[in-house]
């Protein structure tokens, strides 16, 4: 009687506190199931079989679960359902399962919580830790990711040290576990994310995940598609690529027509248009649609660049940038345009290039309606409306709205001219200037000035030149009233008032008000004279000197004095001559007060005070104040040699 009473009480407790199959089942929707690869589906099937069999082995009278009954009505899961049901009811464990249904006798005991109990009692002795679930739901905002039903519960286990199930026997050992089948894990070490990356410090739950992550540092992509040659870091990505029919991208964005082969990429892209930003940077407040973008962005603030190129040592903040960079060394250009055959090292460059053929300009300015083929060009254009110029020159303080303009400007300080003409050796700051120069050499110059005969291949250069003759003034100096036909000329002139000389020679430290003056000066150090007279072979440092020299051969004197009719080859000669009529002497010596009409005469006079004699004869060492005296002296040595 006593034994029957205990058995009845045990059965009653079992009904009240038992763990049913649905408590340990993992449920998937049709959409979620479609995203699983073969390995994941097999794992799912094995886990579900093990869960059901373990519950059955505890002696609990189970019928076909409601979950499995549902599966039988869903056609996409037919194969797995059939295998699962057959594995439970008709497979190798059927005999043991039926035996457990027929008997309530105690079977082999098992060590749980340091105490030996029977399988008959297991179902009673362990229950759901309801206090864990209550605290779990109170803190469901822990990471901002939304889940539904049991998916949320499973996800929240990652945030908790505790697991779902605890020992019901007064919780003597305080030990917990997450699933009924894993009873052996009670004594297992529960330390999480024990595998850490030595490169960036990121931690992972298992060694295989760490191994996959390390490939992002090394750039290793062991899984390559034989059809298109595309390689992948991860086997799952490779499998997904292989399943996707060639060139098929069924997920198309209606906003910008960009297409995707994967629904998850499409959803992440859509967040860009709708402005949905789940992840926000605490440093600057910038929002991102996915966590990986935020992680990469944070490295801008920290300066962290964990991905380093082994070829040149250059480091990058994200693995994709390193992968693109490596193609510079390898010369690999896997993305080819089907229209013109041009190849690119990155898919984004190909997408932008294709828009040249299609004429597509998806990025439109909301201010003026102007459209662009690249988002970066729209960003730069937007600054013309806001006036923002974030890229500032450290040498002279001039600011620009895009980095390329700053890079070009910096060449004026350094004197760098990377674009050189193969015909004459002349170098330029800009590729466009070189292109114009090359065209000028190979084509006619139809735009000829009627005043001085100078010809131009470009109409804009011709119009600017004509203003010099016509006196058509557009830009006036507010300091002295002097006027100019070009804004750049006014800018340079203003520096004569401010004393600013932003362009400094690195050889001797001498500074200049314009970059062109610095360029000419640098040639005095290098000895370069790129402009040569075809008549006599004499070479000059700058083109204007060659043009003036050519007039000695042609006899041309385009600059005529209106007072006396005397003509000159150079405009500066006419300016000095005109002062003879006006009596103007603007160059005054601070030492003695003597004034001069010509700057060269003034400089010669100043040397009489300082004793400077810059023109020295290499034959005898004698020095002179002015170049005319020096040239006269050199001729005396040539006569002696004759």
From Swiss-Prot:
This is Zinc finger protein 699. It is linked to DEGCAGS syndrome: An autosomal recessive neurodevelopmental disorder characterized by global developmental delay, coarse facial features, and abnormalities of the cardiovascular, gastrointestinal, genitourinary and skeletal system. Other common features included anemia or pancytopenia, immunodeficiency and recurrent infections, and sensorineural hearing impairment. Death in childhood may occur. Signal peptide: none annotated. PANTHER family: ZINC FINGER PROTEIN (PTHR24376), ZINC FINGER PROTEIN 850 (PTHR24376:SF238). May be involved in transcriptional regulation. Belongs to the krueppel C2H2-type zinc-finger protein family. It holds the Pfam family zf-C2H2_4. SUPFAM superfamilies: beta-beta-alpha zinc fingers, KRAB domain (Kruppel-associated box). One of its GO terms (biological process) is regulation of transcription by RNA polymerase II. It comes from Homo sapiens. One of its GO terms (cellular component) is nucleus. Keywords: Deafness, DNA-binding, Intellectual disability, Metal-binding, Nucleus, Repeat, Transcription, Transcription regulation, Zinc, Zinc-finger. It is found in: Nucleus. GO terms for molecular function: DNA-binding transcription factor activity, RNA polymerase II-specific; RNA polymerase II cis-regulatory region sequence-specific DNA binding; zinc ion binding. InterPro entries: KRAB, KRAB_dom_sf, Znf_C2H2_sf, Znf_C2H2_type. CDD domains: KRAB_A-box. Residues 19-90 form the KRAB domain.
């Amino acid at each position: 009687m006593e034994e029957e009473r205990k058995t009845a009480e045990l059965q009653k407790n079992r009904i009240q506190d038992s763990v049913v199959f649905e408590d340990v089942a993992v449920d998937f929707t049709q959409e979620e199931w479609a995203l699983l690869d073969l390995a994941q589906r097999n794992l799912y099937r094995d886990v579900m079989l093990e869960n059901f069999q373990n519950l059955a082995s505890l002696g609990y009278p189970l019928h076909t679960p409601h979950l499995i009954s549902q599966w039988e009505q869903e056609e996409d899961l037919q194969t797995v359902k059939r295998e699962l049901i057959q594995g439970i009811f008709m497979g190798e464990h059927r005999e043991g399962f039926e035996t457990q249904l027929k008997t309530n006798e105690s079977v082999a005991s098992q060590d749980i919580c340091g105490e030996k109990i029977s399988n008959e009692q297991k179902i009673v002795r362990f229950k759901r830790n309801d206090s864990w679930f209550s605290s779990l739901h109170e803190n469901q905002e822990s990471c901002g990711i939304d889940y539904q039903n049991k998916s949320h519960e499973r996800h929240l286990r990652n945030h908790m040290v505790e697991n779902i199930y605890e020992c019901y026997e007064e919780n003597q050992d305080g030990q917990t576990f997450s699933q009924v089948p894993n009873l052996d894990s009670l004594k297992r070490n529960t330390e999480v994310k024990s595998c850490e990356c030595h490169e960036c410090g990121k931690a992972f739950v298992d060694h295989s995940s760490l191994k996959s992550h390390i490939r992002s540092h090394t750039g290793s992509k062991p899984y390559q598609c034989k059809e298109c040659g595309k390689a992948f870091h991860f086997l799952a990505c490779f499998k997904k690529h292989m399943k996707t029919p060639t060139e098929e991208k069924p997920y198309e964005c209606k906003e910008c027509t960009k297409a995707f082969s994967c629904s998850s990429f499409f959803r992440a892209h859509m967040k860009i248009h709708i402005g949905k930003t789940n992840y926000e940077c605490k440093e600057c407040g910038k929002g991102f649609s996915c966590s990986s973008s935020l992680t990469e962005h944070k490295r801008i603030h920290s300066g962290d660049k964990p991905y380093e190129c082994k070829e040149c040592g250059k480091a990058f903040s994200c693995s994709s940038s390193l992968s693109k960079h490596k193609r510079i060394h390898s010369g690999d250009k896997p993305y080819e345009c089907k229209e013109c055959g041009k190849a690119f090292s990155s898919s984004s460059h190909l997408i932008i290039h294709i828009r040249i053929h299609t004429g597509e300009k998806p990025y439109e300015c909301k201010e003026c309606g102007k459209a662009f083929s690249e988002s970066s060009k729209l960003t730069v254009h937007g600054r013309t409306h806001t006036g923002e110029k974030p890229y500032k020159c450290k040498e002279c303080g001039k600011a620009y709205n895009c980095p390329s303009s700053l890079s070009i400007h910096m060449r004026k300080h350094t004197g760098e001219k990377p674009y050189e003409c193969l015909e004459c050796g002349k170098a330029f700051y800009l590729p466009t200037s070189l292109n114009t120069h090359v065209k000028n050499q190979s084509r006619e110059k139809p735009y000829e000035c009627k005043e001085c005969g100078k010809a131009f291949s470009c109409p804009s250069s011709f119009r600017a030149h004509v203003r010099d003759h016509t006196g058509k003034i557009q830009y006036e100096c507010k300091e002295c009233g002097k006027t100019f036909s070009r804004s750049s000329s006014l800018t340079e002139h203003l520096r004569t008032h401010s004393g600013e000389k932003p362009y400094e020679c690195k050889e001797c430290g001498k500074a200049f008000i314009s970059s062109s003056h610095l360029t000419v000066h640098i040639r005095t150090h290098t000895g370069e004279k790129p402009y040569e007279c075809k008549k006599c072979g004499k070479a000059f440092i700058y083109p204007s000197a060659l043009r003036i020299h050519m007039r000695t051969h042609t006899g041309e004197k385009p600059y005529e004095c209106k007072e006396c009719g005397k003509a000159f080859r150079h405009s500066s000669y006419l300016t000095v001559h005109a002062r003879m009529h006006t009596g103007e002497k603007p160059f005054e010596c601070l030492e003695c007060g003597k004034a001069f009409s010509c700057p060269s005469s003034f400089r010669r006079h100043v040397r009489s005070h300082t004793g400077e004699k810059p023109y020295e004869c290499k034959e005898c060492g004698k020095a002179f104040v002015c170049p005319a005296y020096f040239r006269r002296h050199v001729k005396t040595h040539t006569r002696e040699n004759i």
